[in-house]
């Protein structure tokens, strides 16, 4: 757990040659080609020890057992989107037995949750249009900037903090990235095709779209304006990796806050 919380221990950048040298039992060329990353030159291996164990398992477990495991994984992931018997078994184990829930949510709630998960920023645009006008965002941005200024003045006046520490604190405050209400640029879902053929088929296409969006980021600079939450999410977050804080529109509504 200590190592998992250490950002330095989880940053192990390697080129392909080093990757093959450190984990020679894994077929990296095939992996990158099938994954759509054949031109990727460098990767970060968050946990090298775990990767070694995975490579060893792949080379010691029989191919039939690996296929069986992947088949089970697919069925397990799809269960809540299939017929009633699959859905009931999935709920009975994961929700009733493991979590103590008494009954399944009504279908309309489950459907809304799925749409919210797949088309989060489409729903977000509708939510913002109705509940969070641009003027509310501008007021909140001004409020946060005032708080940043006030915090900077407090840091400068702290008697117990050393000057080098103050400099670091002010440097961090100056690079603080604030996200308020909703993204300035919405996601483009035009490549995602929604059909009336089957629920699961739409989930598959949504997963493929999500995967392609993720793969398209490989080898490119981090988009610091990308949101990790949707505007309609009643929550907020601070991301220490990018030194950013995010307040979605929904958390800026009564009873939490009133713009």
Regions found by a protein language model. Give the residues of each.
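Short amphipathic alpha-helical coiled-coil/interface segments
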Residues: 1, 140-151, 155, 169-180
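Amphipathic alpha-helical coiled-coil segments
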Residues: 157, 180-188
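Noncatalytic, helix-rich "gating/capping" subdomain that lines the substrate-entry/channel surface
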Residues: 1-142, 146
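Active-site-adjacent "gating/activation" loops or surface patches in catalytic cores
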Residues: 197-259
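Long, compositionally biased
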Residues: 9-19, 190-211
